[in-house]
């Protein structure tokens, strides 16, 4: 997992334009050029440690997906915009989730994570529940989850083999 660069614009744009993959995400409008400008502005947020946008990569540097960390609160971070290519290895989801939590909990120093998942996005809802995240609220559109660092430290042992330490 590495932060996005302007050179990733075509990959990001193609992933964000894939209607099957982005069915449960906010829509992206505009062109590759406008996406490039958006990335440039996002890099400023990274410099301020306000938000981070990552490309998920294989050990051979193949681009496998995207994920963002944002909405930083006193002790909690949100993550989302999680997209994984269709032909990515089956372990990409678990590996990227572990990397997100490692970064959020240990690099940034947060104690918990909060995020929402659209209703109907059953695979992602099931993934987070298996991982130990708890639904704390729901509305007509979303389920709202919390996941504590202490819970991560327990589940991390189960999935340690997927961490590239």
Predicted regions mapped to residue ranges:
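Acetyl-CoA-dependent GNAT
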Residues: 33-76
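Conserved beta-strand-loop-alpha-helix junction that forms the acyl-donor binding cleft
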Residues: 114-125
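A short, internal acetyl-CoA/4′-phosphopantetheine-binding micro-motif in the GNAT/acyltransferase core
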Residues: 57, 81-92, 118
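Conserved GNAT-fold acetyl-CoA-binding loop/helix
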Residues: 20-40
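C-terminal "cap" of GNAT-fold acetyltransferases
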Residues: 139-165
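A conserved beta-turn-beta hairpin within the catalytic core of GNAT-like acetyltransferases
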Residues: 71-80, 110-111, 141-143
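A short beta-loop-alpha structural element at the N-terminal edge
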Residues: 1-14
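Conserved acetyl-CoA-binding loop-helix of GNAT-fold acetyltransferases
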Residues: 90-104, 126-130
């Amino acid at each position: 997992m590495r932060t996005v660069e302007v050179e990733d614009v075509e990959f990001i744009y193609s992933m964000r334009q894939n209607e099957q993959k982005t069915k449960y995400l906010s829509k992206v409008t505009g062109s590759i050029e406008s996406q490039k400008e958006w990335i440039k502005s996002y890099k400023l947020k990274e410099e301020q440690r306000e938000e981070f946008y990552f490309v998920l990569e294989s050990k051979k540097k193949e681009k496998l997906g995207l994920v963002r960390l944002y909405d930083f609160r006193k002790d909690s971070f949100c993550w989302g915009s999680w997209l994984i290519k269709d032909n990515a290895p089956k372990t990409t989801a678990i590996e990227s989730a572990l990397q997100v939590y490692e970064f959020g909990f240990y690099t940034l120093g947060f104690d918990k994570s909060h995020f929402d998942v659209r209703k109907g996005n059953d695979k992602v809802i099931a993934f987070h529940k298996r991982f130990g995240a708890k639904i704390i609220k729901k509305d007509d559109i979303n389920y709202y989850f919390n996941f504590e660092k202490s819970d991560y430290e327990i589940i991390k042992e189960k999935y340690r083999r997927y961490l590239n330490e």
